[in-house]
């Protein structure tokens, strides 16, 4: 039976555990999560084990990245299942602080992100989101002091924002993006997929199918504006409320007029029922 990872819930216990992990000059990889772990998270852990000799997984449902009308209260919390998966994956340490540890009553500091990565995508529809993400990730980096940190590319804009923050603030952390892990029908794995009804789950892979078709058409030379309009129409016709379906430069997230403008990423966000799904694909 796999050995359960050590668990730290206070800063002193985290520091003691990290001192033990760093004995003999071990390198440390951090995988930040909000729990409700799936195979996408475990892919991050597998990559982490290749990149460092010790792996820390944080589990913290961060309230500051949720707006009042969003799903903080109902976000899946599956501690026992998560710990079983992390034991099987042979994770060394789980950092599981509570809200009071991360945000004491007198907490008064935020990290605000600017620049090209704030590109009118998630930041437009969830204006609170990146301030919360940058602040909690900055704290996790300060607490755990990892050599590398791994982020899934499903949250592509988040990956770019965190990479920029780590560079700008000289945090000394190498940020590694890990490709999206998908279900057999193409749906990007997400903890929020648990919200989908059977009918919604059957429709959800439409997003990936539309992006694959759009990417193929663009590679074949079709007009970008026409391709994106066709894809948006298909998404809406399938029953989604579309926030955006856009083609952006894969590095800067600047808008592009054609795939000749550089490496291109297609990004989508849409709601089916009350569940908001995001996805992206390279062209």
Swiss-Prot record:
Its main location: cytoplasm. (R)-pantoate binds at residues 65, 158. ATP binds at residues 34-41, 152-155, 181, 189-192. It holds the Pfam family Pantoate_ligase. GO terms for cellular component: cytosol. It is an enzyme of class 6 (ligase). Gene3D superfamilies: HUPs (3.40.50.620), Pantoate-beta-alanine ligase, C-terminal domain (3.30.1300.10). Keywords: ATP-binding, Cytoplasm, Ligase, Nucleotide-binding, Pantothenate biosynthesis. Its EC number is 6.3.2.1. GO terms for biological process: pantothenate biosynthetic process. GO terms for molecular function: ATP binding; pantoate-beta-alanine ligase activity. It catalyses: (R)-pantoate + beta-alanine + ATP = (R)-pantothenate + AMP + diphosphate + H(+). Transmembrane segments: none annotated. Coiled coil: none annotated. The active site is at 41 (proton donor). Beta-alanine binds at residue 65. It is found in: Cytoplasm. Homodimer. Catalyzes the condensation of pantoate with beta-alanine in an ATP-dependent reaction via a pantoyl-adenylate intermediate. HAMAP family: PanC. Belongs to the pantothenate synthetase family. The reaction proceeds by a bi uni uni bi ping pong mechanism. This is Pantothenate synthetase. It comes from Nitrobacter hamburgensis (strain DSM 10229 / NCIMB 13809 / X14).
């Amino acid at each position: 039976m796999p050995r359960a990872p050590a668990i730290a819930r206070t800063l002193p216990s985290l520091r003691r555990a990290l001192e033990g992990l760093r004995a003999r000059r071990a390198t440390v990889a951090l995988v930040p999560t909000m729990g409700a772990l799936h195979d996408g998270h475990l892919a991050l852990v597998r990559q982490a084990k290749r990149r460092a000799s010790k792996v820390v997984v944080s589990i913290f449902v961060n309230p500051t990245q949720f707006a009042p009308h969003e799903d903080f209260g109902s976000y899946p919390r599956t501690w026992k299942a998560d710990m079983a998966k992390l034991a099987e994956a042979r994770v060394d340490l789980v950092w599981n602080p509570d809200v009071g540890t991360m945000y004491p009553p007198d907490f008064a500091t935020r990290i605000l992100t600017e620049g090209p990565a704030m590109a009118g995508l998630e930041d437009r529809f969830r204006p609170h989101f990146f301030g919360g993400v940058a602040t909690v990730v900055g704290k996790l980096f300060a607490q755990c002091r990892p050599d590398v940190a791994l982020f899934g590319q499903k949250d592509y804009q988040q990956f770019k924002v965190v990479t920029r923050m780590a560079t700008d603030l000289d945090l000394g952390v190498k940020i590694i993006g890990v490709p999206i892990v998908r279900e057999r029908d193409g749906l990007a794995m997400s903890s929020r997929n648990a919200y989908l009804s059977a009918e919604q789950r059957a429709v959800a892979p439409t997003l990936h199918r539309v992006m694959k078709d759009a990417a193929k058409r663009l590679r074949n030379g079709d007009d970008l504006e026409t391709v994106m309009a066709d894809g948006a129409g298909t998404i809406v016709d399938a029953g989604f409320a579309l926030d955006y379906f856009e083609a952006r430069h894969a590095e800067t997230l600047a808008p592009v007029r054609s795939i000749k403008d550089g490496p291109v990423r297609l990004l989508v966000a849409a709601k089916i029922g009350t569940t908001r799904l995001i996805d992206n694909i390279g062209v």
